Structures are given as C-alpha cells and as structure tokens.
Amino acid sequence: MHPLPADHGRSRCNRHPISPLSLIGNASATSGDMSSMTRIAKPLIKSAMAAGLVTASMSLSTAVAHAGPSPNWDAVAQCESGGNWAANTGNGKYGGLQFKPATWAAFGGVGNPAAASREQQIAVANRVLAEQGLDAWPTCGAASGLPIALWSKPAQGIKQIINEIIWAGIQASIPR
C-alpha cells in the first residue's frame, strides 16, 4: 500500500483534489476528512430515511383504504334506480347507480353504463368513491351504509397525509 503524499487534499499530480468519498476505508484518513464525509453523509441518510417513510406510509394508506368497509351498492342502486342495473330513464344518467356518461368514461367505464354488468358498474363506482366520496351520490349515498363524514373526499385526505409526511422528511433532511 502506498502512503498518501504530505498534501492529503491533492492527488499525486497536484491538479485534482481528492474527494472525501474516495477516502472511505482509508486507514490514513484524518479526522478532518471524516468530518467532511459526515457532513456529506448525514443529509443523504436523512433523505433516504424520509423516502423510506414516504414509501411505507403510501403502502400503509393503500392497505387501510382497502381494509375499510365496503358500501352496499345494491342499496344505493335500489335508491337510485329501483334496483334496475339496466336503468335508462331518460334523465341523462344510466345503470343501477345512475352514472352520467362523462363520469362513467372518466373512471374507466366502457360503452353505456346501462349495458354494463352489475359487477362492472360496481368496479367503476368504487373508483368514483375513492376520488369523490359519497358526494357523487348526494341523494342515495347514505343508503350505502357508510358514514358520510368518513367517505366525503377520501382521496383528498390521503393526499394531504402523504404531503405532510413528505414535507416532514424534507425538513428532517435539511442540515442544521
């Protein structure tokens, strides 16, 4: 092993400084070199930890969202359309859950909601519920059996929680 030159901050040809990261594992690194590495490593470690927290919280919020109670879509359909999943009453809304064509298409529905199966309508309704809450069914949402307060704009609440976690991670990674 070759000893370092007397000038630890320069390479052998004295043109390029040696990076503190290149001294990792070098037994002859000085305490000044180590404190330089610490200044670099601390924010990186804090950022990695913040990213891990955000990832974990997103996984947890997804698990919590799926673990919640399911709405009674048959009861909502009974209220909206008399339980007729093929309803076309001429009011501009279709199917058992009375979708407007624009809402149906925006949340992944294909064709006319009145021609879709009960299961297809429920799949789209679950996506609408996740984004808009029970407010999407202002008259019959209460028939779902879910507490209106919990299901009014659930995606907004999850987004707010994630933003707060990200902000806390950013604050934690700023060197003081």
UniProtKB/Swiss-Prot annotation:
<comment type="function">
    <text>Stimulates growth of stationary phase M.bovis (a slow-growing Mycobacterium), reduces the lag phase of diluted fast-growers M.smegmatis and Micrococcus luteus. Sequential gene disruption indicates RpfB and RpfE are higher than RpfD and RpfC in functional hierarchy.</text>
</comment>
<dbReference type="GO" id="GO:0010628">
    <property type="term" value="P:positive regulation of gene expression"/>
</dbReference>
<keyword id="KW-0378">Hydrolase</keyword>
<dbReference type="GO" id="GO:0010629">
    <property type="term" value="P:negative regulation of gene expression"/>
</dbReference>
<feature type="signal peptide">
    <location>
        <begin position="1"/>
        <end position="29"/>
    </location>
</feature>
<keyword id="KW-0732">Signal</keyword>
<dbReference type="InterPro" id="IPR023346">
    <property type="entry name" value="Lysozyme-like_dom_sf"/>
</dbReference>
<protein>
    <recommendedName>
        <fullName>Resuscitation-promoting factor RpfC</fullName>
        <ecNumber>3.-.-.-</ecNumber>
    </recommendedName>
</protein>
<comment type="similarity">
    <text>Belongs to the transglycosylase family. Rpf subfamily.</text>
</comment>
<keyword id="KW-0843">Virulence</keyword>
<dbReference type="GO" id="GO:0009372">
    <property type="term" value="P:quorum sensing"/>
</dbReference>
<dbReference type="GO" id="GO:0016787">
    <property type="term" value="F:hydrolase activity"/>
</dbReference>
<dbReference type="Pfam" id="PF06737">
    <property type="entry name" value="Transglycosylas"/>
</dbReference>
<dbReference type="GO" id="GO:0005576">
    <property type="term" value="C:extracellular region"/>
</dbReference>
<dbReference type="GO" id="GO:0042127">
    <property type="term" value="P:regulation of cell population proliferation"/>
</dbReference>
<comment type="function">
    <text>Factor that stimulates resuscitation of dormant cells. Has peptidoglycan (PG) hydrolytic activity. Active in the pM concentration range. Has little to no effect on actively-growing cells. PG fragments could either directly activate the resuscitation pathway of dormant bacteria or serve as a substrate for endogenous Rpf, resulting in low molecular weight products with resuscitation activity.</text>
</comment>
<dbReference type="InterPro" id="IPR010618">
    <property type="entry name" value="RPF"/>
</dbReference>
